[in-house]
Amino acid sequence: MPDLRLKVTRVKDGDTIVAEAQNGDTVDVRVWGIDAPETSQPYGTAATNLARDVVGEEVVDIDVMDTDRYGRVIARVQANGTDLGRTLARRGLAWHARRYPTSSTIKEQERDARAEARGLWTQDDPTPPWEHRGTSA
């Protein structure tokens, strides 16, 4: 059973959504286990669009893992049984997050996407989002 069921009101980027509780409160949710390219990076728009396709305006299941320094909930996000983090990693539109413990499944999804040159892995040397932002992972 999920910790929360919320309605997605906005997809900010590939790994961040805004969702609304039944009482009208909104929550910024960072997708656990991945780091998607920033919208200003190659494949950032593709990651955002895929996130919209998977969770846009859906009621999603939120399994809270943590909160970050910005006050966002760090959570597994699923819509209709589809895990957003795993889907982005499998399509080659996210790295597994180095700063948080990540499931072995997400690491495997990234490894397979790299091996099969999917998404951002078609680039010779893609810049991870944490380097693009100038932060450590």
Task: Identify the residue ranges that each predicted region occupies.
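Small beta-barrel nucleic-acid-binding modules, primarily SNase/OB-fold domains
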Residues: 1-137
